[in-house]
Regions:
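Single conserved hydrophobic/aromatic residue that forms the stacking wall/gate
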Residues: 1-11, 198-208
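Active-site pre-lysine segment of PLP-dependent enzymes
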Residues: 5, 9, 20-55
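Hydrophobic residues in well-ordered beta-strands that form the structural core
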Residues: 15-16, 82, 130, 164-166
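Conserved core segment of the aminotransferase class I/II
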Residues: 36, 40-111, 115-124
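Residue-level recognition of strand-loop junctions within catalytic nucleotide-signaling folds
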Residues: 66-67, 97, 142, 183-185
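Conserved glycine-rich beta-strand-loop-beta hairpin in the small C-terminal domain of fold type I
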Residues: 93, 109-118, 128-141, 174
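PLP-dependent enzyme catalytic core of the Aspartate aminotransferase-like
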Residues: 146-147, 155-165, 169-201
Length: 208
């Protein structure tokens, strides 16, 4: 991949968060940084069971990659605890060994929510590309609203009772976007789209 070229020349140490690796749609497979030539010399990759297996709060996952970095992490962790609660470890092992059908079910659920949201926004005149992975949808604010992300997010919350994340919270280049989380079922998503259409169908605020 083009993004991987010269990885070792740019970063001497790299930590890759692969939390959403299993939440992929339409045949897409999320890449691992460890696929990149030379990455195992400088990188480690973290995976959590929180997203793929609906185990948030269990604090269970694993790290793989550069042996020296993992050794340092293991030493550091040993200063804080002596291992995870055994039943949680057993549950994690069971999920990894026998949880493929459950992961597929989770993916299908998020795909349905993604399609409902993106199709709804596009029918309202937005131009939203369906993401190939994760439980989030980034949508560019249509120019007709003449607003940046924070102001638009406030209006959605105050006038339509719909909560989104303003893109500016992720950096200056996100200020023309808002981020939706696919945490509600299809019916609630349709309700949110209807409320948004009713309350902000026309531009009402000047761009800041």
């Amino acid at each position: 991949a083009s993004w991987s070229r010269g990885l070792g020349d740019v970063y001497k140490r790299q930590v890759h968060d692969l939390a959403y690796a299993d939440l992929c749609f339409d045949g897409y497979k999320a890449p691992s940084i460890l696929e990149v030539d030379g990455a195992k010399d400088i990188a480690v990759e973290f995976f959590t069971l929180s997203k793929s297996y609906n185990m948030p709060g269990w604090r269970i996952g694993f790290c793989c990659g550069n042996a020296e970095l993992i050794g340092a992490l293991a030493r550091l962790k040993s200063y804080f605890d002596y291992g995870h609660f055994t039943p949680v470890q057993v549950a994690g092992i069971e999920a990894l060994n026998n949880g493929d059908e459950y992961v597929e079910e989770i993916c299908n659920m998020y795909k349905s929510r993604r399609d409902t949201l993106c199709d709804g926004l596009n029918s309202m005149g937005w131009e939203v590309e369906k993401p190939k992975a994760t439980m989030f949808v980034w949508a560019k604010i249509p120019e007709r609203f003449n607003m940046k992300s924070l102001e638009f997010s406030k209006i959605l919350l105050e006038e339509a009772n719909v909560a989104v994340s303003p893109g500016i919270g992720f950096g200056e280049y996100g200020d023309d976007f808002i981020r939706f989380s696919l945490i509600e079922n299809d019916q609630r998503t349709k309700q949110a789209l209807k409320l948004s259409l009713i309350h902000i169908s026309e531009p009402t605020r000047p761009r800041s």
